[in-house]
Amino acid sequence: MGQNDLVKTLRMNYLFDFYQSLLTNKQKNYLELFYLQDYSLSEIADTFEVSRQAVYDNIRRTGDLVEDYESKLRLYQRFEKRRELYNLMKQSLNQPELLKQYITQLEELE
């Protein structure tokens, strides 16, 4: 798996965590098997007795859908920003003014 594939898989795992409640059962099943359990398209197709192309199309469309949700709701983006601020805050415990700035930024995310 290349670096780009790994980054995409990690991103899709996060997006799935954030937006799975907005997906149909079939969409959830396909994404979970493909991205979380590392099933191949053929394995998923065999499991659900459909073609590889049907699985591929569903995964691609569902991936586009969760990306669309993210562009509108930005849950993952805000999560990443909060995580970044948390790490900066841990490093700034002895710098109260800097810590206050990070807290303000964190509050603005809500």
Swiss-Prot record:
Pfam family, one: UPF0122
Organism domain of life: Bacteria
InterPro entries reported in the protein's UniProt record: RNA_pol_sigma_r3/r4-like (IPR013324), UPF0122 (IPR007394), UPF0122_fam_protein (IPR054831), WH-like_DNA-bd_sf (IPR036388)
SUPFAM superfamilies from the UniProt entry: Sigma3 and sigma4 domains of RNA polymerase sigma factors (SSF88659)
NCBIfam families linked: PRK00118.1-2, PRK00118.1-6, YlxM
Family of the protein in this entry: Belongs to the UPF0122 family.
Physiological role: Might take part in the signal recognition particle (SRP) pathway. This is inferred from the conservation of its genetic proximity to ftsY/ffh. May be a regulatory protein.
Name of this chain's protein: UPF0122 protein SERP0802
Naturally occurring in which organism (per UniProt): Staphylococcus epidermidis (strain ATCC 35984 / DSM 28319 / BCRC 17069 / CCUG 31568 / BM 3577 / RP62A)
